[in-house]
């Protein structure tokens, strides 16, 4: 199973161009305001010179050209269901993304840090008006199955969400490669403000190029992932309530 996971991750890197729970309540993910002219409608020359804006598909999700934190901008789902921080070097992956009606949306993306030789792969799925989304145990069983995980999840709570998180380190002993490991973080963010509303997430970090030094640090990986998880904010239409 580990060998299959590693091969899948390696293929993902090749196909994509070689390819702490901190409190972020003050982050503007809680602010529904947007720019008068959206980034997707602007001239790329006037946008930040980073992949998140220079990639045509990715900038469709960008809320503003304002940097929320150093290296991070604000992403909004196509269904306008949630917002979260997005790395400036992140790029949207169409083959791992989908839009299903008005109640489900998946967004896949990745980023590559040339300085550290670390590839970051992310995938989030938004659920609305789905009864199973209101059952953390059911959702975590689904997440565990997708990530070949049999352990427990850590729960934390913010003002309007409950966050469930698990992590694991995969070491691929049967692969002849120097950097034969990766760190994965996955779980579920459930709205406590509205029923049947949540976001499933999975993030993996691994070394991309075997013939280059790699600085994959577990603490830095955890901090990066937790920053994104904690930034997830649901956009609830009060008129519907």
From Swiss-Prot:
This is Putative lipoprotein YvcA. Residues 23-46 have a biased composition (Basic and acidic residues). It comes from the Bacteria. Disruption phenotype: Overall loss in complex colony architecture and lack of fruiting body-like structures. GO terms for cellular component: plasma membrane. It is a lipid-anchor. Residues 22-48 are annotated as: Disordered. Induction: Up-regulated by DegU and Spo0A. Repressed by AbrB. A lipid is attached at residue 19 (S-diacylglycerol cysteine). A lipid is attached at residue 19 (N-palmitoyl cysteine). Keywords: Cell membrane, Lipoprotein, Membrane, Palmitate, Signal. It is found in: Cell membrane. Residues 1-18 form the signal peptide. Required for complex colony architecture.
């Amino acid at each position: 199973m580990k060998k299959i996971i590693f091969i899948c991750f390696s293929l993902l890197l090749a196909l994509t161009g070689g390819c702490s729970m901190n409190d972020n309540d003050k982050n503007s993910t809680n602010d529904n305001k947007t720019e008068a002219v959206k980034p997707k409608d602007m001239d790329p020359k006037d946008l930040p010179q980073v992949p998140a804006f220079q990639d045509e598909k990715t900038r469709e999700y960008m809320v503003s050209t304002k940097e929320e934190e150093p290296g991070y901008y604000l992403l909004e789902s196509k269904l306008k269901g949630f917002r979260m921080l997005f790395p400036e070097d992140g790029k949207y992956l169409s083959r791992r993304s989908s839009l299903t009606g008005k109640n489900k949306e998946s967004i896949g993306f990745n980023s590559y840090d040339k300085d550290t030789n670390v590839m970051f792969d992310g995938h989030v799925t938004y659920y609305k008006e789905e009864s199973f989304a209101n059952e953390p145990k059911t959702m975590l069983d689904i997440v565990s199955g997708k990530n070949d995980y049999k352990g427990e999840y850590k729960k934390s709570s913010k003002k309007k969400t409950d966050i469930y998180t698990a992590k694991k380190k995969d070491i691929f002993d049967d692969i002849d490669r120097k950097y034969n490991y990766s760190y994965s973080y996955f779980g579920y963010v459930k709205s406590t403000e509205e029923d049947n509303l949540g976001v499933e997430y999975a993030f993996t970090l691994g070394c991309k190029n075997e013939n280059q030094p790699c600085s994959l640090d577990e603490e830095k990986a955890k901090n990066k992932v937790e920053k994104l998880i904690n930034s997830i904010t649901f956009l609830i239409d009060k008129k519907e309530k």
